């Protein structure tokens, strides 16, 4: 049965993939559904499987609303969601509403065992169908066949349901439509008599489900499952069937269906009617136009309705989140479980509605209908244009025909006149005498010539007229052909749009029904559950769970007065104050160890905690000249003079806060009993101690702002709730203290600096080495914590944060704190600074020569690749690269000193970025693309973006890539500086020669991935430490070694902020002690310049240098 050809299936009404192409959610059409709603057979009972269990396996599938109730009775999972019950097992059916979100578990067979299991299930299903066929078609036991057939049908469908629940991708439209048809045929079969038509229809339905299921399994095993055939999520009504789409359950088909079929004309008759009537094409085009407007109105209506529903769902979710905690806070409240479940249901309903709105917008309604409308309009305009073109051709032919007809008549009249004149001339010649014959003959000849010309013109006009008549007939026929074609195309477009509207409408109302169908059930369930509650039940439960002892029996007796003279309240209290068990307050905290006892450590610790909380309160204002402190050695209180602050006098409240901070620090520094405190760090004091301060804000001594000033963080004026630093006079909003990025410089902060867009030569004057502070600051922070960040310099930062960081640099200069900023924001600031320079780092005058070098290099590389294709070797490409590197070295030497120093500093940093290429994914090529237009750009012109600059982007990137890769060759004579050193500290790392001229081999790759430089910055408390890597030799080519020249530097670990000559000893190549580092150092007293390194040369793939005798100290 499963081996028959699928073409036999074409005899039965089915859904082809071609018809489903225009539908976003293909549904079964009316021609494929059974037309009768027969009564249920008593022998087909629903299985014991609960709906929630069924939904657990197929909760993410979509199914049509038309699945038969008998499929449900046979075990088909009809609902994508569990029925609302008292257990909270409801899940939103839209959790996987699209085929792309189907569950991965069980989607495809994992191995041979799963395929074997699937094939075994298919065999069981085939056996069930064979049994069903034998049971239905047997000739004996006519009346007893009905319950037996229903039992066989249920068994076969249960097997099918198990397969579909295990492999959800088998749940297709064709399979379940065929199942519904088979169920209808089994119900409608007349078992009392052998009707041949019933047998043929039953066999056809059986063949249909067999072929459909086998084809679906085959496509599933081959991985060719069409996602468009997956079913939509059905409503949760298990009684819904395919027959219910036609109305109530009557014995025959409803009358409205028959009337609809009688009134519906075939497409050919519709076209014939429009062809025969006048203006048929125009009427069809107008209908198509109205239909496009109708689709637009539908989309607008559904969009507004969906927006309202989404707002309602979000508002409902917000109400549930706000009220759930307060409602469920107290246990044992009446009907608490009911309202808890109602809250859960409302939350799930809100989630479902939000997801349903998203599905409507992107999958099922708005997007498909919008695309269909656009396509509908495009096709309508094309058909309209072709129809109007054919009409214009016919009109032109008719106009030509009228002109030709008029000309033909005129020529014929002229010919008749000419003939009459000739006849008249002949008569006159015959009536005259022989003496006048010469003049008459001449006139006669002339009139004959005119008559001949008129005749020729009449014949030409007749020919033209006949041609125009033929052309008009041709154009008329072409217009008729165009009319037929246009009507057929218009009807096709309209039917496609109808199908899209139908599918979208079915999907929409199915989705809405699925969302709203559980609501009445939920409310009814909550109502019935509420009826079961007995008043006072929860109160009794609450009282029963109280863990209280029995109330003691209290007796009231008279006690006579007894006098005791030795008793004294004062002595009693004073004695109790030294009791270590009852000690509390300052007396207990200040008691000496011998009185308080050392065994009571835990109580004393508790009392210290209470005391520590109290000392943060402001002291009384009456204490003006002295402050109360603690002597950490004896625990006694003493008085000391208050030190005056460097700023203006603070208010009394600030004085109290400062005194409280001092006492708190005294209490925190040592315990009263001589023990270490628990919390060594004191709480922040002052008027802003309760505000979350940033790292930079904690470096300021803040007080309340007295006069209006401009906030250095947000660049707006501060009038109220402002803070001011006593030392640097920085003003800031109270709320801006949480994000303040400017540290305290312990001197008055200067005014705002125009940093971005400033001339580079002016910016470089502020630093001794010519590298602007913003470049050092950003590079140091990136190397400290962002060398491994993926996409550094390629990923842009957040625009608002970048603007605030730029503003902080202009306000605070080198005092900006970057430890809390995003690495991408910092890199964006650096790129923005370099990009906004009036003249780029590589001057304008080098642009054309550098671009020419890049062009020549790319051309030589392409020629070398073409020449070396099919053979080994790349010497020509290496030679071209070496030539370009040599020319780059010469050009870079002509750069201004500050530009060269900054470029050298930046390229060293980019080399460290490249060393971490495996982590940050930033190759030299990527960095060249990022920094090419930034460091190298042409002189600006009147045009916004010139075409040449766009063409030169690859060449700019090539130049920067070459500078990064061959950095060691281009800048081989440059000394190595530690990034971030702003005082010119002599941290010369990477010397390649020893005192006796020892040759160090080149290093191919860093062993531990990267080598970060040391930073001793006077404007930031962050330091970068050198990671020393041992030198290693390799056998690679000389060019590749030279491209990693800077990796050959020996790691010399130097203490931070070293201001004296180092006495460390270098290690030689073979592990033996090398020369002392002091031989390479210059005099450090008042020395702010560096001695240049000796010249390095390439000999046999190794770097050699001069001896230490060639190096002389330089004094400044």
From Swiss-Prot:
GO BP, sorted A to Z: regulation of small GTPase mediated signal transduction; signal transduction
Biased composition (Polar residues): 22-31, 621-635, 1080-1090, 1105-1116
Site (Arginine finger): 794
Zinc finger (Phorbol-ester/DAG-type) residue numbers: 699-744
CDD domains given in the database record: C1_GMIP-like
Compartmental location: Cytoplasm; Cell projection, Ruffle membrane
Span of domain Rho-GAP: 758-971
Coiled-coil segments on the chain, per record: 375-498
Comment, domains: Rho-GAP domain is able to regulate RhoGTPase activity, actin cytoskeleton and cell spreading. However N-terminally BAR domain plays an autoinhibitory role.
Modified residues (Phosphoserine): 23, 72, 92, 98, 568, 577, 591, 618, 946, 1017, 1020, 1022
Entry-linked PROSITE patterns: F_BAR, RHOGAP, ZF_DAG_PE_1, ZF_DAG_PE_2
Biased composition range(s): Basic and acidic residues: 448-457
Biased composition regions of type Low complexity, renumbered to the chain: 643-652
GO cellular component: cytoplasm; ruffle membrane
Superkingdom classification of source: Eukaryota
Record key words, sorted: Cell membrane, Cell projection, Coiled coil, Cytoplasm, GTPase activation, Membrane, Metal-binding, Phosphoprotein, Zinc, Zinc-finger
Chain spans, region Disordered: 1-72, 422-457, 569-658, 1004-1035, 1050-1116
Protein name, per record: Rho GTPase-activating protein 45
Statement: the UniProt record of this protein carries the keyword Zinc: yes
Gene Ontology MF terms: GTPase activator activity; zinc ion binding
Signal peptide: none
All copies of domain F-BAR, residue ranges: 268-538
PANTHER family: RHO GTPASE-ACTIVATING PROTEIN 45, SPERMATHECAL PHYSIOLOGY VARIANT
Chain ranges passing through the membrane: none
